[in-house]
Structures are given as C-alpha cells and as structure tokens.
Amino acid sequence: MLGIVAETPSGGTPGWSTRTVLNKFPALAPDAVAPQGHDPMHETIAAKGFHEVIVESPFHDADLPTLDIAQITDVVTTYHQRFCALSKRPGVEAVVLFRNHGTRSGASLVHPHAQVVAVPLVPPRLQAMVAWGARQGAQTGKCPTCEELARELQAGVRVVEESADFVALVPFAAEVPCEAWLVPKRHSASFADACETELADLAALLGRTLQRLKAAHGDPPYSFAIESAGPGSDARYLHWRLRIAPDIVNPGGFERGSGMPINPSSPEADAALLRASWDIGSLDVGSLDHDSGRGEVKT
C-alpha cells in the first residue's frame, strides 16, 4: 500500500490529477538517528528529513512537456504545495525539489514523477548562491539577479522566452549545453512566495521550455531543480529559480578532478537553438498564452 501524502482531484472526472506518496527508498527519514561515537575528523549528522515522490499523472506513458496546460499547472501547483508543507516541518533547513528524466540523469521509474526532499542543512550549492548574492548585494544594495535579468532582457541574445512573470534564459556561465533558467521577474528569495498567477505562468513556460529542449536535442536526459532559499533563512539578495540541466555531454577527467565544468557550446548559440526549436504538435498550444515575449507562437 502506497503511503499517500496528498492528492489533487481530477477536474470534472473521477480519480486524481497528481498524487504525492512517501518514497519507498528514502534518502532521509524523520526517525533517523546519528551514528554512534564521535570522531572529530569525520563529522556526521543524522539523515533526518523527509523524502516524497510527486506522481505527475495517472497515465504511465505520459511525459511532463506533452501534458496539457491544465495538467502541468496541477503539477507545478503540487510542487509548490509540497515545498511549502515540508518547509514548515521542524528541523528542516532547505527543501530540494527536483525531477530526473531518462536513466542517464538518474530516473529509476518510467512513470512521470518528481521528488521533493527536506534536509536538515543548507546544501553547498544553495550556500554558494546565498554567499554570492550577499557579496554582490553588499556592494550595490540590490539583488544581483534582478540586475542581471534586466541586462539579459535588454540584450536578448541569451533569452529563450519572456512570459508575463518569468524569463527563460541560458545563463552567461552555463555549466552544460542548453542549460536553462526559469527566473521570476518579481524579486523573491523563496519558491514558497510564488502566487497562483505566477505558478500558472511558470507551468506554461516550463512546458514550452522542455518542449524546445526535446525538439532541439531529440528528447535528451535532463534534471531540473528548484533552487530556493530555505525556511527562515536570511537570504534577501537570493533570487530563486528553476534550473534545467540537460545531460548531453559526459564530464571527463578534468571536470571530475578540478570541479570545473567545461561547456563546449556557447550560451548565445544554445539560446538561439532553443528559440528556434518548437515542436508545435506536441503541446496544447491553443490553450497557452504566447502573446508576450521572445520565441512566441501565434495560433
């Protein structure tokens, strides 16, 4: 029997639209205990937290970018609900919501799903984001991502699409080919602060961006994660985002040995490729609002 945590009912029909269950093989557990003994050379903590699976559709052969817009909106709304719920649990310092597509990127199940993990510490990547924002913000008094977003929109060369509330872009220092960030225009440190209108806009843009990636590279494996401030953190200069990282090239010895990524393609070329890649037959484009921004589709 599945440990069902939450369900979104299917609009107008029996059954469910999204379902959240406990992970059968959790990386963390609420009753985890710390290892016995103390070794100052090897610091450890209990793997105490929560690990859930968000089932994105009742249909086994569905895929997130090819779902209709109402279903993708249900999915993103469920992301938000579980992110907020787990953020309120005692001892949680950060919530990591991610999705793997393809076995090469770590997907162990074919059925469309995402995962959400609440952890008792701030992950290193988030620590680096917070530190960078604080360092830049101390000099200017402004959010560096907000300033960067304004420059990107003015230049346009790395922008994939602009919607009402978000910008999809390939970042200047993209770590992998066709890496894409979906960044809210409104400054906010936490995904928890997103409103209903923003969630619907994010859902539509996420579907279109994944469809562009699929058309450009033939359905490559990828992972995406929501990079956001944790509950109660002082991250006034952090700006949350959804980061899509395609698994198109294999890291070699230099990357593994140095921790420095090598990206063989330019972000400008990748952004142009994604703008030009649009498989119009695979999305319910008639229900999407494409009237704003670059890379638009008219129906």
Question: For the regions a protein language model found, what residue spans apply to each?
Answer:
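HIT superfamily nucleotide-processing domains
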Residues: M1-T299
